[in-house]
């Protein structure tokens, strides 16, 4: 494979896309392909199948926007530096285990999130969804996929306004069941600040006021989701650990 220029859409292209590709039984058996967006940003895609029949797929792009642009609710890459995308997946016997990382992006106009923020009495943050968007600096999702069932072991998104940690499953076109924790950034700061020495080092001795977060459940058919929330007074060690990572 050796292509001088490949257009991903009307605005994005990859230069010097080259590498090796082997297809068996109408599936990619092996791939090692790379290209450049420009002198700094690049893309690399690999597929390797080992002796026990496990297929390992990786995709790294130092520009995430061209790859996620079709998801209309993800915005903001053009505002302040491109975020990157890093994907890893291993598949065997029809079951894939994957990790997706996206860096520095905004989300806009997500009805389920807007309802969750409203129920949590975080209307000011909810208003951002229809305005400039809510920014997340770190996003990671660990999940498995078998047939049409996606199981999310852990999804976390950390941002300057809110942070979210959730788990659950999505059965394509049938049922969504998610549960997790949503916390405003001020609450995270206050909780970390309460840790002796560490809090003073990371946050300082003066911490702004803020509300505690909520635990939530989102369940139902994709077009008829029911959202419930309950206030929380403490953060789990896992949530704080993820925030500090």
Can you describe what each PLM-predicted range is?
Residues 1-13, 18-219, 241-244:
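Small-residue helix/turn framework positions
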Residues 223-245:
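Gram-negative outer-membrane assembly/targeting C-terminal domains
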């Amino acid at each position: 494979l050796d292509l001088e220029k490949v257009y991903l859409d009307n605005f994005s292209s990859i230069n010097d896309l080259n590498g090796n590709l082997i297809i068996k039984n109408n599936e990619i058996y092996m791939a090692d392909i790379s290209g450049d967006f420009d002198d700094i940003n690049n893309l690399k895609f690999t597929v390797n199948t080992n002796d026990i029949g496990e297929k390992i797929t990786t995709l790294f792009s130092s520009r995430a926007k061209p790859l996620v642009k079709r998801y209309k609710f993800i915005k903001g890459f053009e505002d302040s530096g491109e975020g990157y995308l890093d994907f890893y997946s291993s598949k065997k016997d029809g079951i894939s285990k994957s990790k997706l990382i996206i860096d520095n992006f905004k989300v806009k106009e997500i009805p389920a999130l807007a309802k969750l923020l409203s129920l949590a009495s975080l209307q000011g943050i909810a208003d951002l969804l229809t305005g400039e968007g809510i920014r997340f600096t770190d996003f990671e999702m660990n999940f498995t996929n078998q047939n049409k069932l996606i199981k999310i072991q852990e999804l976390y998104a950390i941002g300057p306004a809110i942070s979210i940690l959730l788990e659950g499953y999505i059965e394509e076109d049938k049922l969504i069941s998610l549960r997790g924790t949503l916390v405003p950034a001020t609450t995270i700061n206050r909780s970390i600040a309460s840790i002796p020495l560490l809090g003073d080092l990371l946050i300082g001795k003066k911490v702004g006021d803020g509300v505690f977060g909520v635990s939530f459940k989102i369940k139902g058919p994709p077009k008829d989701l029911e959202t419930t929330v309950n206030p929380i007074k403490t953060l789990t060690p896992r949530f704080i650990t993820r925030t500090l990572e």
